[in-house]
């Protein structure tokens, strides 16, 4: 049925229509005269043309000698958006790609409008020298690294990788290690030759204890004692034990103590020949010793964003100190993580990875980013080698987050297809992917179309969901958001597992990881869109009504600030000084 006319739009009487037509004719005549006299009302003049403006992005950049930086120009006020590029100190293509020359100093890149040659915009480019390479290989009868001393039977060729770790050209024999490994319980200061990846056991220190005795994860047969003969392909990881366990603060969570009895580790790699000065250390899991090169890093792919809250932005040096030394990641629950600088819980690893990667998206100079970039890429290389060797970090509550991002970060910067496709070659080895799933994929397929509160993407539970949609373990350890809260499985009448871990120990640590991948434009190579949709849900979904309904149906209360969706800061507050950094970055750049 057609809507009736509104009283104000109904036709008037005939005289009124006539008056309206007279007025319309006068108005048209006036408009015609105006069009002949121009905008200023002066006969014979044309309207002022729009002003052409041009801007350039970024307005400043720091580039190493011989490296490239992409610039772009934005034109307004004309349909001709063509620009003419020019540069000092290097060359620039017609597409705005600048290549730095060999001279160090400050130079400019300029974009000039071809519609109006009087309009241009310039950016300042600081060309810097590359970071000095490690010293060239030499000979030595012993070497010292971060408190570990290895003594050889004779002088051998030694050198350092780009991250500072040592190599020797083998074969060699180690006759002494300081501090010396103990030969009886408690087993301290252990050295392990060629870390195992099959069973998650450790040989560094027998005092494994995270509040309960975990010593069954220790295997004394993994320990090596001098004399140790090493051949090319071998990797010796030597450790220093803490004098007393549970004394080091947990990295990224200051109120806790690290669960590990290991203070620090150093890695000695045995090669058949000295590598180039820009070589990364091969992964400690990689017996084939694949070597990647720092000079191959596409550092210009890192954005140069303004810190949204400078006072809440941590210094690069803090995370350089965390990642400079090896993060050993082959013990099933990180009971032997080097406590001085590595977290002993997956959630805290994910937080550290988030901070490190997001810092590298900011507008620090190229020189300032070099060290942390190298260290973070080295961690990615190590993890990738372990994945290739058959190790993985499948879902287990909050233990297995944080390992995928460093691999993909390294893969993007090295343009390495194997790293970029790690989850294609090795499905079901990353906690974040197994614990985020579209609800309609839960078996039997098509049974569920939405979660209890309407969400399409849900938390996959403690053990998660495999890439093929199969549930690792149903019930207590499986997905549950497809059910009403009254039907959620319980550990006991006073404890939930799934929702408690969703809010305490997993989701909150994935936000920075997802944002870093967005900023690298690497969502496709992550190869699991449910992860990004879930993180968006965590940050944008108002859970006020859901929390009230959970309380009404089950009696469990998740209303504490640190348990709420839409934040990371309340979990980090009091644990890390710059606790709003991830939230600030999300608000500004997501």
Predicted region positions:
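Ser/Thr/Asn(+Pro)-rich, low-complexity disordered segments
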Residues: 134-404, 417-590
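Solvent-exposed, low-complexity, repeat-rich "mucin-like" stalks and linkers
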Residues: 57-79
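Short, well-ordered beta-strand segments
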Residues: 76-89
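Extracellular/luminal low-complexity segments enriched in Ser/Thr/Pro
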Residues: 93-105
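N-terminal secretory signal peptides that target proteins for export/translocation
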Residues: 1-18
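A short beta-strand micro-motif common to beta-rich folds, especially ectodomain repeats
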Residues: 104-116
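Bacterial Sec-dependent N-terminal signal peptides
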Residues: 26, 30-55, 117, 124-135
């Amino acid at each position: 049925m057609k809507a009736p006319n509104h009283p104000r739009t109904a036709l008037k009487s005939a005289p009124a229509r006539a008056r309206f037509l007279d007025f319309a004719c006068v108005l048209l005549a006036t408009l015609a005269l105006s069009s002949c006299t121009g905008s200023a009302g002066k006969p014979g003049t044309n309207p002022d043309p729009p002003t052409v403006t041009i801007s350039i992005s970024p307005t400043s950049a720091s580039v190493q000698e011989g490296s490239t930086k992409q610039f772009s120009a934005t034109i307004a006020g004309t349909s001709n958006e063509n620009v003419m590029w020019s540069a000092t100190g290097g060359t620039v293509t017609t597409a705005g790609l600048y290549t730095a020359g060999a001279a160090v100093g400050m130079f400019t890149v300029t974009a000039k409008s071809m519609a109006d040659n009087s309009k241009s915009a310039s950016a300042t480019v600081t060309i810097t020298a590359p970071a000095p390479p490690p010293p060239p290989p030499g000979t030595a009868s012993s070497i010292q690294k971060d408190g570990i001393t290895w003594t050889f039977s004779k002088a051998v060729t030694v050198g350092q990788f780009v991250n500072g770790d040592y190599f020797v050209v083998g074969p060699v024999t180690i006759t002494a290690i300081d501090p010396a490994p103990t030969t009886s319980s408690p087993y301290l200061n252990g050295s392990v030759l060629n870390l195992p990846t099959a069973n998650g056991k450790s040989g560094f220190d027998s005092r494994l204890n995270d509040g309960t005795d975990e010593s069954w994860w220790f295997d004394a047969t993994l320990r090596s004692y001098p004399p140790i003969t090493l051949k090319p392909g071998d990797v010796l990881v030597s450790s220093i034990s803490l004098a007393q366990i549970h004394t080091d603060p947990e990295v990224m969570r200051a109120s806790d103590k690290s669960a590990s009895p290991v203070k620090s580790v150093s890695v000695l790699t045995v090669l058949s020949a000295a590598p180039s000065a820009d070589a990364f250390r091969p992964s400690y899991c990689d017996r084939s010793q694949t070597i990647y090169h720092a000079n191959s890093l596409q550092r210009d792919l890192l954005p140069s964003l303004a810190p949204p809250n400078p006072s809440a932005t941590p210094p690069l040096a803090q995370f350089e100190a965390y990642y400079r030394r090896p993060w050993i990641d082959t013990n099933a629950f990180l009971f032997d993580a080097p406590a001085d600088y590595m977290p002993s819980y997956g959630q805290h690893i994910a937080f550290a990875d988030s901070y490190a990667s997001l810092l590298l998206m900011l507008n620090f100079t190229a020189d300032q980013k070099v060290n942390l970039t190298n260290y973070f890429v080295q961690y990615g290389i190590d993890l990738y080698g372990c994945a290739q060797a058959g190790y993985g970090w499948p879902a287990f509550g909050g233990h297995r987050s944080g390992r995928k991002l460093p691999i993909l970060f390294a893969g993007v910067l090295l343009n390495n297809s194997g790293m970029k496709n790690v989850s294609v070659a090795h499905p079901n080895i990353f906690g974040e992917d197994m614990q985020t799933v579209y609800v309609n994929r839960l078996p039997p397929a098509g049974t569920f179309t939405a979660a209890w509160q309407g969400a399409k993407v849900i938390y996959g539970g403690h053990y998660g969901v495999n890439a093929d949609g199969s549930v690792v373990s149903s019930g207590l350890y499986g997905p549950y958001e497809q059910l009403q809260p009254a039907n959620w499985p319980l550990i006991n009448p006073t404890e939930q597992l799934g929702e408690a871990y969703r809010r305490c120990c997993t989701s909150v640590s994935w936000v920075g990881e997802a944002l870093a991948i967005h900023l690298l434009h690497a969502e496709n190579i992550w190869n699991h869109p449910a992860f990004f949709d879930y993180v968006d849900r965590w940050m944008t979904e108002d859970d006020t009504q859901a929390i009230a309904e959970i309380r009404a149906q089950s009696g469990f209360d998740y209303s504490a600030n640190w348990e709420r969706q839409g934040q990371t800061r309340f979990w980090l507050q009091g644990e890390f000084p710059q606790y709003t950094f991830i939230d600030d970055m999300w608000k500004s750049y997501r």
